[in-house]
From Swiss-Prot:
Biological process terms in GO annotation: translation
Keyword terms: Ribonucleoprotein, Ribosomal protein, RNA-binding, rRNA-binding, tRNA-binding
Record InterPro entries: Ribosomal_uL5 (IPR002132), Ribosomal_uL5_bac-type (IPR020930), Ribosomal_uL5_C (IPR031309), Ribosomal_uL5_CS (IPR020929), Ribosomal_uL5_dom_sf (IPR022803), Ribosomal_uL5_N (IPR031310)
The keyword RNA-binding appears for this protein: yes
Protein name per the record: Large ribosomal subunit protein uL5
Record bears the keyword Thylakoid: no
Record function comment: This is one of the proteins that bind and probably mediate the attachment of the 5S RNA into the large ribosomal subunit, where it forms part of the central protuberance. In the 70S ribosome it contacts protein S13 of the 30S subunit (bridge B1b), connecting the 2 subunits; this bridge is implicated in subunit movement. Contacts the P site tRNA; the 5S rRNA and some of its associated proteins might help stabilize positioning of ribosome-bound tRNAs.
Protein's gene: rplE
Species of origin: Shewanella woodyi (strain ATCC 51908 / MS32)
Similarity comment: Belongs to the universal ribosomal protein uL5 family.
Subunit annotation: Part of the 50S ribosomal subunit; part of the 5S rRNA/L5/L18/L25 subcomplex. Contacts the 5S rRNA and the P site tRNA. Forms a bridge to the 30S subunit in the 70S ribosome.
């Protein structure tokens, strides 16, 4: 079992219950899923690019990604309906906790010129979205094996009712927010 999951059950959950005055443990906010999304617009011109993106995403998430396709044709972007334009992975359960642990302890400290995560990236319902400019911050990616540096979106979906609860939950997991 992941260390962060144990930490949540033993310390974080009781602390949040006391802090927000919840009467039941089920009211305490928890992380429901983590979604990783990588847009690969260059895949329209070169099919190999999508294979490399899928390989990188599989290594990072530990789970096979789903290829996302264009919903409608856009002449300006030279894409047609049904063209592969990205990939995404939804992590839940054990893999989610392991990914969160790697993200907080290893990947975020490796971001260049890092000054803390923005607190403005909450959506109003306690969910947090962040962008990563380089996939090489993850230890699973070998620098000499990548074809191109790609970024990705990471969305942490919580059961929190508002941003204050969501932020308290993520801060309890040592998420480095800007002061």
């Amino acid at each position: 079992m992941a260390k962060l999951h144990d930490k949540y059950q033993e310390t974080v959950s009781p602390e949040l219950q006391k802090k927000f005055g919840f009467t039941s443990v089920m009211q305490v906010p928890r992380i429901e899923k983590i979604t990783l999304n990588m847009g690969v617009g260059e895949a329209v011109a070169d099919k190999k690019v999508m294979e490399h993106a899928l390989r990188d995403m599989t290594a990072i998430a530990g789970q096979k990604p789903v290829v996302t396709v264009a919903r409608k044709s856009v002449a300006g972007f030279k894409i047609r309906e049904g063209y592969p334009i990205g990939c995404k992975v939804t992590l839940r359960g054990e893999r989610m906790w392991e990914f969160l642990e790697r993200l907080v302890d290893i990947a975020i400290p490796r971001i260049r010129d890092f000054r803390g995560m923005s607190t403005k990236s909450f959506d109003g319902r306690g969910n947090y979205a962040m962008g990563v400019r380089e996939q090489i911050i993850f230890p699973e990616i070998q620098y000499d094996k990548i074809d191109k540096i790609r970024g990705m979106d990471i969305v942490i979906t919580t059961s929190a009712k508002n941003d204050e609860e969501g932020r308290a939950l993520l801060e309890a997991f040592n998420f480095p927010f800007k002061k």
